[in-house]
Amino acid sequence: MVEKFVGTWKIADSHNFGEYLKAIGAPKELSDGGDATTPTLYISQKDGDKMTVKIENGPPTFLDTQVKFKLGEEFDEFPSDRRKGVKSVVNLVGEKLVYVQKWDGKETTYVREIKDGKLVVTLTMGDVVAVRSYRRATE
């Protein structure tokens, strides 16, 4: 089921991402340019339930990140937004990848799903919701 997420994805649209970054406590220099970032996502799968999500933002920057995980298993994460003590878990729920991060008594959720051939990521922190959509890159 996760196979449909595998591949290279380029940003197509971003809504409210800067506000989302503010809500999670990202530094001002990150949140101010949130919707202007143009990331490419590389999603790969190995041995069924092991995945890697790599995010590049054009020329190499401190915002670039890579996360390796096994579905359903909690892992320590070191996000590029500089939050500390983040524990994350990613689960396949129906046809969606649901990614939950917890730190300092807070929680945020990323839901990745395929809609009309696009990868749509809905990020939620409290009552702040951001939506970013990606188109599959042509090789």
Curated annotation (Swiss-Prot):
<keyword id="KW-0963">Cytoplasm</keyword>
<feature type="binding site">
    <location>
        <position position="112"/>
    </location>
    <ligand>
        <name>(4Z,15Z)-bilirubin IXalpha</name>
    </ligand>
</feature>
<dbReference type="InterPro" id="IPR000566">
    <property type="entry name" value="Lipocln_cytosolic_FA-bd_dom"/>
</dbReference>
<feature type="binding site">
    <location>
        <position position="61"/>
    </location>
    <ligand>
        <name>(4Z,15Z)-bilirubin IXalpha</name>
    </ligand>
</feature>
<dbReference type="GO" id="GO:0008218">
    <property type="term" value="P:bioluminescence"/>
</dbReference>
<feature type="binding site">
    <location>
        <begin position="132"/>
        <end position="134"/>
    </location>
    <ligand>
        <name>(4Z,15Z)-bilirubin IXalpha</name>
    </ligand>
</feature>
<comment type="similarity">
    <text>Belongs to the calycin superfamily. Fatty-acid binding protein (FABP) family.</text>
</comment>
<dbReference type="GO" id="GO:0008289">
    <property type="term" value="F:lipid binding"/>
</dbReference>
<feature type="binding site">
    <location>
        <position position="57"/>
    </location>
    <ligand>
        <name>(4Z,15Z)-bilirubin IXalpha</name>
    </ligand>
</feature>
<dbReference type="InterPro" id="IPR031259">
    <property type="entry name" value="ILBP"/>
</dbReference>
<dbReference type="InterPro" id="IPR012674">
    <property type="entry name" value="Calycin"/>
</dbReference>
<protein>
    <recommendedName>
        <fullName>Bilirubin-inducible fluorescent protein UnaG</fullName>
    </recommendedName>
</protein>
<feature type="binding site">
    <location>
        <position position="80"/>
    </location>
    <ligand>
        <name>(4Z,15Z)-bilirubin IXalpha</name>
    </ligand>
</feature>
<dbReference type="GO" id="GO:0005737">
    <property type="term" value="C:cytoplasm"/>
</dbReference>
<dbReference type="Pfam" id="PF00061">
    <property type="entry name" value="Lipocalin"/>
</dbReference>
<comment type="function">
    <text>Beta-barrel protein that binds unconjugated bilirubin with high affinity. Excitation of the bilirubin-bound protein gives rise to green fluorescence, both under normoxia and hypoxia. The apoprotein is not fluorescent. Does not emit fluorescence in the presence of ditauro-bilirubin, urobilin or biliverdin.</text>
</comment>
<comment type="subunit">
    <text>Monomer.</text>
</comment>
<keyword id="KW-0599">Photoprotein</keyword>
<dbReference type="InterPro" id="IPR000463">
    <property type="entry name" value="Fatty_acid-bd"/>
</dbReference>
<keyword id="KW-0455">Luminescence</keyword>
